[in-house]
Each structure stands twice: as structure tokens, then as C-alpha cells.
Amino acid sequence: MKQGIHPNYREVNVTCSCGNKFVTKSAMEKENFNIEVCSLCHPFYTGTQKIVDTTGRVDKFNNKFGNLFKR
């Protein structure tokens, strides 16, 4: 690797909006970085993910436009 062309690699303090804090390494200039979602509060990891039921939407569409496509 060439010398002097790579950015400095330093520790960065990451703070989530849920209050979780951790330290990671990055080439970014700032020492502190704020995020909105982390693995402790993301719905996929917490199991609070909602499944959208589209059946009602399909029925509503068919009631409104169903007779337009019949032959």
C-alpha cells in the first residue's frame, strides 16, 4: 500500500437515539456520531416488526375497479 494516501483510522463514539452508546473505528473526522436506529431498537432485531396486511387494499381495489377488467 502507498504511504500517506490513506485517511487516519480512529475510534468514534456512536450514540443512538434510544440511549445505546458504543465505540467503533472509522475514517470520519468527527469523534462523536449520532444515529437514529441501532441493533437494540431496530424492529427487525427487537421482534416488534409489523406485517402489513394488504388483503383489505386488494378487496377495496377490486370493489372499485373490478368490473373494468371483466370480459
UniProtKB/Swiss-Prot annotation:
Q: Name one GO cellular component term.
A: ribonucleoprotein complex
- List residues binding Zn(2+): C16, C18, C38, C41
Pfam families according to UniProt: Ribosomal_L31
* UniProt keyword annotations, A-Z: Metal-binding, Ribonucleoprotein, Ribosomal protein, RNA-binding, rRNA-binding, Zinc
> Subunit notes for this chain?
Part of the 50S ribosomal subunit.
Q: Which gene encodes it?
A: rpmE
Database matches in PROSITE patterns: RIBOSOMAL_L31 (PS01143)
> What exactly does this protein do?
Binds the 23S rRNA.
Q: Which residues form a coiled coil?
A: none
Q: Which Cys residues form disulphide pairs?
A: none
Identification of the protein by name: Large ribosomal subunit protein bL31
Q: A Gene Ontology biological process annotation?
A: translation
Matches recorded under InterPro entries: Ribosomal_bL28/bL31-like_sf, Ribosomal_bL31, Ribosomal_bL31_A, Ribosomal_bL31_sf
Q: Name one GO molecular function term.
A: structural constituent of ribosome
Q: Which family does it belong to?
A: Belongs to the bacterial ribosomal protein bL31 family. Type A subfamily.
Q: How is the cofactor bound?
A: Binds 1 zinc ion per subunit.
